[in-house]
Amino acid sequence: MGNDKTNMIIAIALSLAVLLGWNYFVTAPQVERQRQQQAAQVNPSQGVNPSQGVDPSQGVNASPSPKEGGPSAPVPGTLPGAAGGSPQAALARDEALARAPRVRIDTEALRGSVALKGGRIDDVALKGYHETVDPKSPEIVLLSPAGSANPYYAEFGWVGQNAGPLPGSDTVWTADGDVLTAKKPLVLTFDNGAGLVFRRTLSVDDKYMFTIEDSVENKGPNPVTLYPYGLVSRWGKPHTQGYYVLHEGMIGVVGDKGLQEYTYDKMAKENPLGAPGTRGVSWPGATGGFLGITDKYWAAATIPDQQAPYTGSFTERDEGATKVYQASSLGEARAVAPGASVQASQRLFAGAKEVSTVDAYREKLNIKQFDLLIDWGWFYFITKPMFKALDLFYKLFGNFGVSILVVTLILKLFFLPIANRSYVSMAKMKAVQPEMTAIRERYADDKVKQQQAMMELYKKEKINPVAGCWPVLIQIPVFFSLYKVLFVTIEMRHAPFFGWIRDLAAPDPTSIVNLFGLLPFTPPDLLHLGVWPIVMGITMFLQMKMNPAPPDPVQAQVFTFMPIIFTFMLGSFPAGLVIYWAWNNLLSILQQYWIMRRNGVKVELWDNLRSTFQRRTQVKTAKG
């Protein structure tokens, strides 16, 4: 049973090593290849012209109805005439913005503009976030217009039949003001000259939520049928982090279907949907939720009326060598009789995935499961409370690094009864180690009798041989939950600790390989070995030396090299996670020392260290 315990610990450690190592040797090269491929692509400029003849039953990306618009009629989110067009060179972002008259967006959190030509929200930058820890570095740009290198925008409007010209990418709206603020909405109007007057009221709060209220008044002699839609479109596959613990790509909660997550690679494998060259998935008859595109820290999502049924869809389509990703919702038919009007209300989230902000939108706006916009992972029930605890102590101490230390200490105290029983059992096993060795020697050729004798010894001394596994097993979900919090929550981004750690979500910037910056080169990730990873490795080594070496020489070698392996593996992990592990190891050493002394068991740390270094000295002398 003692060997079973050791084997279990080794298996867990090796499993962790495989999972962590996968990112180094498999995922990272794939991500780099994708980045190089994307850099070689030329992004086409594009516009949008909502169709006069869309079959609404097929969703926003549906092919035009031949009876109404003909085979070349444009569709929302597509490039008019794209089938026969050729890609154009991308413009600089400022040049692309200058191609259309605009109304400024200016709030506490956002700056940007609304394009009057097309009526899109296609220019959004985040005031409170910068590209690096330097506050003078450029602000994060989230949305960009058609024609730029990385088009990413939101579009809202109507599709329908027998309605005449509908607002599209070439439509120039009339605005009632020159700025959109949290206190001053913007009203856009357009008369299609065929009896329909379109009015759009745009408002924005002091964070990242836009409200789009569309109305159509029918002044013509005939009834029309219209379908409201909202979409988020992204041209070109973006550079992704490429980690298995993080979702990047299409995301949504679609009515009763719940959370839907599709990576960019997964979209390429979907079945054809709608227009030729388009792949995707759709969910008709949904009510409530959202659909969008998410990055690690940022997202853009269209939010349909939470009480009205809609068809949701994720699509990928080909525009030359460029992939276009789109998340969209298409509402049900709205009949507009002569002299009548119809309204549709939708929202757009475009900003940082701040936990408090996202949670507040879910509660105040009643957006179904909107908090899942943040990728809390499988351990949601642990990960989110973990963040809440860290955030609580951050508000008390003003430092997330200190918060990590405090939460780790509280977790240690919370699990103290389990750990105490575990360490007491381990201490007792150390006390009977001579008897266990004698049993192994006495029944060396009879494993059955050896096990029976061991069990009798455990029963006599009241030892639980698997109790030592509990601290390791308990730490695994806590470790991954903290890793998830550090990795996906924007609150940890650019959060400093002390000294040289200016970003807990980034690796320790120092490296022993270049003598902590004295040598003028940057080592590769695999050789990136900062101060905190070294401290973690030392504490892990000391923790293992608290116990005698396993009798099996193979296991002893595994235990010897494990701290070295983990030191290199965690070298490129978030500094906050490495600090947690080092601090947790130190607390475990102190806890085990106290319990062993309390139970009258000799602490063999110094003896084991002395034995280890003496043995290595003897080996070197023998070789010499």
Swiss-Prot record:
It is a multi-pass membrane protein. Keywords: Cell inner membrane, Cell membrane, Chaperone, Membrane, Protein transport, Transmembrane, Transmembrane helix, Transport. Gene3D superfamilies: 2.70.98.90. Residues 43-64 have a biased composition (Polar residues). Residues 36-95 are annotated as: Disordered. GO terms for molecular function: membrane insertase activity. The chain crosses the membrane at residues 8-28, 370-390, 396-416, 470-490, 526-542, 559-579. InterPro entries: Membr_insert_YidC (IPR019998), Membr_insert_YidC_N (IPR028053), YidC/ALB3/OXA1/COX18 (IPR001708), YidC/Oxa/ALB_C (IPR028055), YidC_ALB_C (IPR047196), YidC_periplasmic_sf (IPR038221). GO terms for biological process: protein insertion into membrane; protein transport. CDD domains: 5TM_YidC_Alb3, EcYidC-like_peri. It is found in: Cell inner membrane. Belongs to the OXA1/ALB3/YidC family. Type 1 subfamily. This is Membrane protein insertase YidC. It comes from Methylobacterium sp. (strain 4-46). The lineage of its organism: Bacteria, Pseudomonadati, Pseudomonadota, Alphaproteobacteria, Hyphomicrobiales.
